[in-house]
């Protein structure tokens, strides 16, 4: 068994997994924050992770993205993603405060529900074609849809993904109190899924995102319109 060290600021022990889903590697790892432990690294994510005082910075190299264009001409499966396994038979909520460094169009910080490279959901704070920063959601089932949502003028945003086993909701907040619904999906994903965080720089030369207050709980929100309650 080959063993590699794969973190910039901590010793994250990584061993290759048998199934390689991503173009640049799919490995087990152990990166621990106060309320979540990431156990899987896609596309070298653990090698580009820095943890300090409970905060995590994840860097993306140039031209990294996860997107499968509906026209079938583009498929980029190279974004660094840190994941943790989740029992989808039970409720869950993943929340994080995200502060991207925007340098180029489509730079973003994201949250994921991940099954495989052509079956996933992501929610992002992204820089659009006009240079505005906005919420974006993408659902990939073979190919990717792409949805632009509200413009965000603050430098940071709280993002939340929650499921009661039947419905998945995407939400954002500027104050961690009042939540805005972005999108609802039917939860028709497998019994075991992966959830996590990512950074992307599809057109740029790389960027980084600061993730704070990353929390995974085994409860869902109670109001899927307001995004509140346990």
Model-derived regions, located:
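Extracellular glycan-recognition regions
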Residues: 22-230
């Amino acid at each position: 068994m080959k063993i590699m060290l794969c973190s910039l600021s901590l010793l994250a022990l990584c061993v290759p997994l048998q199934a390689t889903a991503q173009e640049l590697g799919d490995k087990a790892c152990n990166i621990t924050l106060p309320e979540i432990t990431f156990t899987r690294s896609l596309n070298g994510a653990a090698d580009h992770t820095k943890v300090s005082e409970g905060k995590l910075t994840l860097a993306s190299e140039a031209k990294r993205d996860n997107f499968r264009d509906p026209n079938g001409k583009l498929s980029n499966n190279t974004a660094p993603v840190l994941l943790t396994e989740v029992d989808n038979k039970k409720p869950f909520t993943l929340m994080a405060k995200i502060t991207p460094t925007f340098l180029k169009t489509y730079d973003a910080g994201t949250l994921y529900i991940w099954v495989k490279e052509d079956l996933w959901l992501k929610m992002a704070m992204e820089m659009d074609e006009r240079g505005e920063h906005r919420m974006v959601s993408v659902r990939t089932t073979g190919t990717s849809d792409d949805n632009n949502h509200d413009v965000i003028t603050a430098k940071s945003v709280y993002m939340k993904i929650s499921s009661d086993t039947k419905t998945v909701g995407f939400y954002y907040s500027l104050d961690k109190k009042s939540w805005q619904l972005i999108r609802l999906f039917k939860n028709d994903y497998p019994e075991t899924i992966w959830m996590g965080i990512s950074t992307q720089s599809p057109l740029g030369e790389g960027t980084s995102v600061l993730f704070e207050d990353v929390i995974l709980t085994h409860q869902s929100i109670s109001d899927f319109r307001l995004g509140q309650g346990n």
